[in-house]
Amino acid sequence: MNILPYRIIINRHLYANRDIQYFNINIPKFFANYKYFKIILKDVSCDNRSQDVWLNCDALTYNQVSQHTDPAIRGIFLEKFLFNLTAFREGGSQSHYVILPYRDTLKFWITNIMGAKPGMDCTVVMILEIEPYDI
């Protein structure tokens, strides 16, 4: 049975005036067999095209990966990511991903707070893929 890639669909509604939505993603126990795993932001849609929206994973320090270069090759293991979902959906990036040591739960938040424009109602749908990562 091939379960890879493991896909997660996130659907969140953000309200006007700067909303933050928190949610957890449980990582399947299958990934405990690997020391690291990769989370990839595959697709984003938003019903309000003028709204800036950000996705964050609460792990450790800020970083944004927008290159195809594999950070593990440089010996860097990213422990947090902050993605501008607006730039992603408008073709501003070809690859958004983070490599993390295995853990069973990740806490995320999505917000319209950090955008330059005031917060407006919007519904955001994201597709995340999780796959094992071997160095």
Task: Locate each region found by the language model.
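Flexible assembly/topogenesis modules
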Residues: 1-135
